[in-house]
Amino acid sequence: MSERLVTSNEIGIDSTNEYSLRPEKINEYIGQDKVKERLNIFIKAAQRREEALDHVILYGPPGLGKTTLANIIANEMGGNLKITSGPAIERAGDLAAILTTLNTNDVLFIDEIHRLNRSVEEILYPAMEDYVLDIIIGKGAASKSIRLDLPKFTLIGATTRIGMLSSPLRDRFGVLCSMEYYTDEQLKEIIIRSAEILGCHITEEGAFEIAKRSRGTPRIANRLLKRVRDFAEVLYDNEITEEAAKKSLEILEVDGEGFDRIDNKILEAIIDNFNGGPVGIETLAYFVGEELDTIEDVYEPYLLQKGFIVRTPRGRMATDKAYKHLGRVRFNESKIDSKQCTLFEK
C-alpha cells in the first residue's frame, strides 16, 4: 500500500530536506501566534534570570510543528535538542541513560509522552522538580539508592492525547501549550518560504492552491509542495502557478478540500449506497474496503472536523456539505438534527 499524501503522521518523504525547511528562531516561526507570544516571554524571562526554561507540554494533532518548536526553544536557550519518544523508553534505565547525557539548558523532547509507562514516569518526577536522578544499585537486601545531580534542563513533552497524561506528570509541567490548525494564509506563507529554500519558483496563487488542500497542517503542506515541485520541474518550467498546482494535485488525487480517494469513497458510500445514512461503521468499512480502525482513526476525524459527516446514535450520516462536494442532490428533505448528533458517539 502506498503512503498517504494527506496523512498528518510522518511518512518517508517528510525526511527529505526536513531540517532545512524548519525555522531556527521563534521570530521565523509562522503561525501559532498565541503559543509563540507566551513562549517568547517565558524564554526571555528565563534568560534574564539565567535559569532553565520551565518544562513545557505541547499538545494537539500531529504535524503542527511540535518538534520544530522544541528545536527553536533549544536554540533560543543556547542548548542542544535531544529527541526520543514514549514508546522508545521501555525501562527506567533507558531514561536514566538519556538524562545523564544532558548539559545545562539542553532540551529533552519526548514525543508521544502519554505512552510512557508508570515506572519511567516515577524517574521523571524528581528529575523535573529537583534536577536529581535516583537510581538503585544492586538487588535485594544489598541494594542501595544513589542520588545524582542533573544539570538544569528543560523537558518538552508532545502529545496528541493530553487527556491520557497522568495527573502527577501533567502537574509537573509549568507551561501547557495547545497547538491549533493553521489557516490557509499561514500555510501559504510556509509554502512560499519552503519553496524558496528548495529553489523552486512559486506564485502566491500556486502556494494558496496547495495551502487550501493541506488540511491546516504544515507537514502536509510541505509534503504536497515537494510532490508538486516534481511536476513543475518536468511539465511547467520549474514554476508552480495556480494551474500547475491544481493539475498536479488532481493527478495526485488530492481534491480542493484536501480529500484523497478514500475520503471521497467514504462520502460516496454513505450517500450512494445508504441515501446519506445513517450507516454503521462496520458496514461502512466493508463497503469502502478498509479496516474499521483505519476508518475511525485515519479517515473519519478530518471528515468530522470539516463537517462532511456526523455521528448519530444510529450511525454515520452525510451532511449537506458532503452532497454539495460530490455534486449530489439530497432527495430526502429531512435535515440532520444537530442536537441528536455528537462527535463522540460510536
From Swiss-Prot:
What InterPro entries does the database record attribute to this sequence?
A: AAA+_ATPase, AAA_lid_4, DNA_helicase_Holl-junc_RuvB, P-loop_NTPase, RuvB-like_N, RuvB_C, WH-like_DNA-bd_sf, WH_DNA-bd_sf
Write out the ranges of the annotated region (Large ATPase domain (RuvB-L)): 1-182
Residues annotated as region Small ATPAse domain (RuvB-S)? 183-253
Pfam families from the xrefs?
A: AAA_lid_4, RuvB_C, RuvB_N
Summarize where ATP binds, as residue positions: L21, R22, G63, K66, T67, T68, E129, D130, Y131, R172, Y182, R219
Q: Which SMART domains match?
A: AAA
* UniProt key word DNA-binding: yes
Binding positions (Mg(2+)) = T67
Molecular function GO labels? ATP binding; ATP hydrolysis activity; four-way junction DNA binding; four-way junction helicase activity
Say what the protein does.
Answer: The RuvA-RuvB-RuvC complex processes Holliday junction (HJ) DNA during genetic recombination and DNA repair, while the RuvA-RuvB complex plays an important role in the rescue of blocked DNA replication forks via replication fork reversal (RFR). RuvA specifically binds to HJ cruciform DNA, conferring on it an open structure. The RuvB hexamer acts as an ATP-dependent pump, pulling dsDNA into and through the RuvAB complex. RuvB forms 2 homohexamers on either side of HJ DNA bound by 1 or 2 RuvA tetramers; 4 subunits per hexamer contact DNA at a time.
Q: Which HAMAP family match?
A: DNA_HJ_migration_RuvB (MF_00016)
Name of the protein in question: Holliday junction branch migration complex subunit RuvB
Q: Which organism is it from?
A: Clostridium perfringens (strain ATCC 13124 / DSM 756 / JCM 1290 / NCIMB 6125 / NCTC 8237 / Type A)
| Gene field | ruvB
